[in-house]
Amino acid sequence: MTAITQDAAERDQAQAESKAATLIESLSWLQRFHDRIVVVKFGGNAMVDEELTRTFAEDVVYLRYAGLRPVVVHGGGPQISAMLTRLGIESEFRGGYRVTTPEVLEVVRMVLTGQVSRDVVRGINAHGPLAAAVSGEDAGLFTGRRRGAVVDGVEVDLGLVGDVVAVDPTAVLAQLDAGRIPVVSSIAPDESDPAVSLNVNADAAAAALAVALGAEKLVILTDVAGLYRDWPDRGSLVSDIRSDELRALLPSLESGMIPKMAACLEAVDGGVPKAAIIDGRIPHSMLLEIFTTNGIGTEVVPA
């Protein structure tokens, strides 16, 4: 028999009550999201930090067993840059986009589908045979259209870089219906020549997929706490914002935040009830966003 002091007993009871309160707080959100699709864009530090990658996988598995239908979309910028450096291929950026030659595209495809997707799937499947990799090139999932960029008022060629202009979610829905967690890489065949593929922005791809799937929510992991109205003033963090307010604010945002907030706006405009950017550097931030009343990060809602 193990003796326990009154102070220790009271402390244990307080901790137990706190945990129970947290579980009860999540009840309404479990009801709301039950059997609903949530699209999660995985990126930033969480992709290159082993511990954050592990907790991300735990969160995704938790969503699945809590009755949600999670879909993961990922990029792989840091890994692509590292592989290009290893192969002696120069990385060039124009207007915030990676210039993508046919040689670079082969590296992009190799890293996204052969490295990053497999790593994410492996992390999730450490908890059971749940995840399956799906390339944006598979079964017409994504269709892309080439885009350029404007630098100092001049249109510049980005090579094999594009925007997602059409989504056929059949392959993803098949995985969901089989009880799996789809892990989607952001690469898309060119609409003008399907034999050629394009490097597409993962945030935008996640938004387009969320719309096509009729998702309940889009969550984008970032390396900041959320949207700041006046960066770097940390007192200007926005917890929630309407789509019309965001549309007016978008041109004035810091350049690195624009693609992520534009993706949230695209999702909400397309019928997704809510979209959020959250700090992926915080362990289990995804659970805090989905299953607590106050959430974490910045949430975008329809006007």
From Swiss-Prot:
Catalytic activity, as annotated: N-acetyl-L-glutamate + ATP = N-acetyl-L-glutamyl 5-phosphate + ADP
UniProt binding sites for substrate: 76-77, 98, 199
Cited NCBIfam families: argB
Assigned GO CC terms: cytoplasm
Domain of life the protein comes from: Bacteria
Residue numbers marked as site, Transition state stabilizer: 41, 260
Pathway note: Amino-acid biosynthesis; L-arginine biosynthesis; N(2)-acetyl-L-ornithine from L-glutamate: step 2/4
Gene: argB
Species for this entry: Clavibacter michiganensis subsp. michiganensis (strain NCPPB 382)
Lineage summary: Bacteria, Bacillati, Actinomycetota, Actinomycetes, Micrococcales
Gene Ontology molecular function terms on file: acetylglutamate kinase activity; ATP binding
GO terms for biological process, alphabetical: arginine biosynthetic process via ornithine; L-arginine biosynthetic process
EC number: 2.7.2.8
Gene3D superfamilies: Acetylglutamate kinase-like
Keyword match Nucleotide-binding: yes
Keywords: Amino-acid biosynthesis, Arginine biosynthesis, ATP-binding, Cytoplasm, Kinase, Nucleotide-binding, Transferase
UniProt xrefs under InterPro entries: AceGlu_kinase-like_sf, AcgluKinase_fam, ArgB, Asp/Glu/Uridylate_kinase, Glu/AcGlu_kinase, NAGK-C
Name of the featured protein: Acetylglutamate kinase
